[in-house]
Design a protein with these regions (language model features):
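Glycine-rich Rossmann-fold phosphate-binding loop(s) that bind the pyrophosphate
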Residues: 195-196, 288
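N-terminal Rossmann-fold NAD(P) dinucleotide-binding loop
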Residues: 199-200
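Helix-to-beta-strand junctions that scaffold the AdoMet/dcAdoMet cofactor pocket
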Residues: 276-278
Length: 368
């Protein structure tokens, strides 16, 4: 079949809108009509050329929502008409990682997904006979896409695509880091470094679980108002604060119980660890640093009880947890509407990237 898609031909170049060929689903695969997709910093990270796994030409996009159009042989959990959110972190429920219950990092198809291919090591996308690579197993910058069954979360049918697509990455990454990775408890003091889309979702996750002080740290004073709307209680601007770590330690009577780094800056990661409380402070790294970057601190910081941890996709098990998060949105427990600041047709997707890079948008969403 033919489908309209935004194709990334080379790193550092704008996407071009093409009509590409899409093969139907093979064994264990599902054809999905994407109805809406967010434009995420991770897409830009790959497009910029900084992603060591970036491969071109490719159809990017990993934050979508849509409807099942067809299923391949062997598919048992989905049928035509089901509403779904594609998952860049699948959940097979049978690999060593899934069965351990210690992680959400399913590895069943990781080897091929990282190469831009489907599980059988081929691509479903092509143009004039030239294969086009998949991206993160989802490729939501195409009106139609094929994904493995284990990479699709079935969701309720009354959920609006233009809002819940954001649960495919940003919302889950932020809220999940609080609920599933850190398991923040009532009354805890939390600090969030970086008040973009991920940081705001960390803040609303902290508010959701009943955290006490929720401190936001950002260089942009214009982000304070929105962060307070989502539950932030204190704001620190490093430009006007002599020592951010000392300020947080004083504000929290010895340090934060939990910190979350949502930027991908290794110097900030160090601050995020060292501002946590001696004996039990936990710092969760969410931001993705540039390839080859390393983090450092004095070992004494760890010996005295602080812990550095990472969180991918918020620690969420996609097929299990994403439907719950959709329910939270539909029940009014979390706010997504205020985070989606711009919508556009696929033809304007490059403008969406510019809005994100300039900081004008929290999340731009492409509507098909």
């Amino acid at each position: 079949m033919k489908t309209k898609a935004a194709v990334a031909w080379k790193a550092g170049q704008p996407l071009t809108i093409e009509t590409v060929d899409l093969q139907g689903p093979k064994f264990g695969e599902v054809l999905v009509e994407i109805k809406a997709t967010g434009i995420c910093h991770t897409d830009y990270y790959t497009l910029s050329g900084a992603d060591p796994e970036g491969i071109f030409p490719a159809i990017l996009g990993h934050e979508g929502a849509g409807i099942v159009v067809d299923v391949g042989p062997g598919v048992t959990t989905l049928k035509k008409g089901d509403h779904v959110i594609p998952l860049y972190t699948p959940e097979c429920r049978q690999c060593k990682f899934c069965l351990s219950r210690k992680t959400n990092l399913c590895q069943l198809i990781r080897g091929t997904q990282g190469k831009g291919l489907m599980p059988d090591a081929t691509s479903r996308f092509s143009l004039d006979g030239q294969p086009i690579f998949h991206y993160m197993g989802t490729s939501t910058f195409s009106n139609y896409t094929v994904a493995p069954e284990i990479s699709l979360a079935k969701i309720r049918e009354d959920a609006p695509f233009d809002k819940v697509c954001y649960i495919g990455c940003g919302v889950t990454t932020g809220i999940g880091a609080v609920l599933f990775t850190a398991k923040v408890e009532v009354g805890a003091n939390v600090v969030v470094f970086g008040l973009g889309g991920i940081g705001l979702n960390v803040i609303q996750g902290a508010k959701m679980v009943g955290a006490d002080k929720i401190i936001g740290v950002d260089l942009n004073p214009e982000r304070e108002a929105m962060a307070r709307k989502f539950g932030m209680t204190h704001f620190i601007n490093p430009k006007t604060t002599e020592n951010v770590v000392d300020a947080i330690v004083q504000l929290t009577d010895g340090g934060a119980d939990y910190s979350f780094e949502c930027i991908g800056n290794t110097q900030v990661m160090r601050q995020a660890l060292e501002c946590t409380h001696k004996g039990w402070g936990r710092s969760i790294i969410i931001g993705v640093a540039e390839a080859g970057a390393e983090i450092s601190t004095r070992p004494f910081q760890l010996v005295t009880g602080r812990k550095w941890e990472g969180s991918a996709f918020g620690g969420a098990r996609g097929r299990t947890d994403v439907p719950k998060i959709v329910d939270w949105y539909m029940d009014g427990k979390i706010n997504i509407d205020d985070l989606i600041t711009h919508t556009m047709p696929l033809e304007d997707i490059n403008k969406g990237f510019e809005l994100m890079k300039s900081g004008e948008s929290i999340r731009g969403v492409v509507l098909y």
